[in-house]
């Protein structure tokens, strides 16, 4: 792992929420309180980040699908950027109820979005009346907004990376219901009992989120490289 504790300090990863807004379950990961703000223990953060990074490498090396989720404004753009860099699906606008637990319905909507994409590329919209074309484009834009990051996903994911737990409790609940492993960045207002693996850290600072997600990306790409090499070896021996 390339991230150092010094880098964590530089991006303010140790700053939690106001002490009155804390979740007592995060007490083991809090170093102290300063001016009414909880300070996260970065020695633990570093250890947990290393553990999660190893897990993501192993998951990618096994060919598992990793879904990124983060709709809060500080995370939304970073979620899309990182997911696209490792060809992973993502949700960064709004979690629609049943995105995982009602997967068949979501699959139908994704299929419709892909059909709209094909129609638009092949001039299919030009064959419609102005009103029909306008309606089709409006529906395509709506589907693209909420499902665009999942349009190449064919099955429910094996792992879900979540940024902003308090805002993504529906996603958390669906993961728990289906037994999908979740990886979460936990600020001092979060609940560690709802995450399978986690990194205690500031989830409100763009710089903090970016540093963690960049490490996640590095780990996933390493795993994907291992998976690709394993497949190539399999072809040679076949």
Swiss-Prot record:
Entry keywords, A to Z: Chloroplast, Plastid, Ribonucleoprotein, Ribosomal protein
Similarity comment: family membership: Belongs to the universal ribosomal protein uS2 family.
Keyword Calcium in record: no
GO annotations of cellular component type: chloroplast; mitochondrial small ribosomal subunit
GO biological process: translation
Name the UniProt record assigns to this protein: Small ribosomal subunit protein uS2c
Keyword Plastid: yes
Entry's localization field: Plastid, Chloroplast
Gene Ontology molecular function: structural constituent of ribosome
């Amino acid at each position: 792992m390339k991230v150092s504790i010094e880098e964590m300090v530089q991006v303010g990863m140790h700053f939690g929420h106001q002490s009155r807004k804390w979740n007592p379950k995060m007490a083991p990961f809090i170093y102290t309180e300063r001016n009414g703000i909880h300070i996260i223990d970065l020695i633990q953060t570093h250890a947990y980040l290393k553990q999660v990074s190893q897990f993501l490498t192993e998951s990618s090396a096994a060919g598992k699908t990793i879904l990124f989720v983060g709709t809060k404004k500080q995370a939304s753009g970073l979620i899309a950027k990182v997911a696209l860099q490792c060809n992973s699906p993502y949700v960064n606008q709004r979690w629609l109820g049943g995105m995982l637990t009602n997967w068949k319905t979501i699959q139908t909507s994704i299929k419709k979005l892909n059909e709209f994409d094909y129609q638009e590329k092949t001039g299919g919209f030009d064959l419609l009346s102005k009103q029909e074309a306008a309606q089709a484009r409006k529906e395509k834009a709506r589907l693209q907004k909420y499902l665009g990051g999942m349009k190449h996903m064919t099955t429910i994911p094996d792992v879900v990376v979540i940024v902003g737990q308090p805002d993504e409790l529906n996603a958390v609940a669906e993961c728990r219901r289906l037994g999908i492993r979740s990886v979460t960045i936990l600020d001092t207002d979060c609940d560690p009992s709802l995450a399978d693996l986690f990194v205690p850290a500031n989830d409100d600072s763009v710089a903090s989120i970016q540093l963690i997600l960049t490490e996640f990306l590095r780990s996933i790409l390493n795993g994907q490289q291992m998976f690709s090499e394993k497949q190539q070896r399999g072809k040679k021996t076949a």
